[in-house]
């Protein structure tokens, strides 16, 4: 369960990157892993109302990605766009990647490990 919860938290980290302070994100992760994830997990696992209604969660994927996705969407809506993404007239400022080798390494780690 710890790995499932960490996966949900990592989904959120990708959505709020560069827009939230580290301390605030840690507080949010404690709330997510301590309250939100267990409550939504109990709905599906352990005889919760979703399991009684016939809901099947293959390997925990619905709960993990549901919790992470909804929390990420909520964080993105609350925080808004990254600073410098839009100019005063509303036009989009291009923000090219800053470290392509590190991004490539991260992609390979996710794909193959």
Cite the ranges covered by each PLM segment.
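Hydrophobic alpha-helical transmembrane bundles of multi-pass membrane proteins
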Residues: 1-113
């Amino acid at each position: 369960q710890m790995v499932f919860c960490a996966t949900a938290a990592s989904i959120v980290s990708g959505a709020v990157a560069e827009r939230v302070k580290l301390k605030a994100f840690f507080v949010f992760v404690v709330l997510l892993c301590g309250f939100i994830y267990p409550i939504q997990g109990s709905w599906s696992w352990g005889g919760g109302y979703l399991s009684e209604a016939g809901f099947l969660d293959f390997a925990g994927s619905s709960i993990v990605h549901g919790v992470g996705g909804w929390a990420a969407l909520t964080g993105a809506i609350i925080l808004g766009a990254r600073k410098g993404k839009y100019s005063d007239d509303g036009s989009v400022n291009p923000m090219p990647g800053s470290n392509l080798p590190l991004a490539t390494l991260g992609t390979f780690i996710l794909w193959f490990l």
